[in-house]
Amino acid sequence: MKVLLLLGFIFCSMAAHGKRMERCEFARRIKQLHLDGYHQISLANWVCLAQWESGFDTKATNYNPGDQSTDYGILQINSHYWCDDGKTPHAANECKVRCSELQEDDLVKAVNCAKKIVDQQGIRAWVAWRNKCEGKDLSKYLEGCHL
């Protein structure tokens, strides 16, 4: 009985966290989705951004009490501007997606929304990129990936 309870707890925890991608797996996937070089932003920049925004967790969420918004998914896309979570006041939903769709493991909607963000604001829209990636040697983020 205890084993069944423990297994249930483990599976519930896994479902809540979603898929934590490996660094190179993430790099390969977003390259397939043509994010590498988009607006001259290198693949290493995107990998660095995802590392510091979500730790490569597709289901990551972070609540921002100031504007009552939430950041969603592996790229931590914000509900105040970019998606609809049904609870953020005055949400713009510029990407025309439900925020939960930005947490899908295939990354298609997250990447499409990221392209829209870059079209409008550039990669500087992400605070973690400005703080952890901008102006740094990012070669380590693609090391060993054989892309």
Swiss-Prot record:
InterPro entries found in the cross-reference section: Glyco_hydro_22 (IPR001916), Glyco_hydro_22_CS (IPR019799), Glyco_hydro_22_lys (IPR000974), Lysozyme-like_dom_sf (IPR023346)
Top EC class of this enzyme: hydrolase
SUPFAM superfamilies linked: Lysozyme-like
Main location: secreted
A molecular-function term among this protein's GO annotations: lysozyme activity
GO biological process terms, semicolon-separated: defense response to Gram-negative bacterium; defense response to Gram-positive bacterium; killing of cells of another organism
Name of the protein this chain belongs to: Lysozyme C
Species this chain originates from: Trichosurus vulpecula
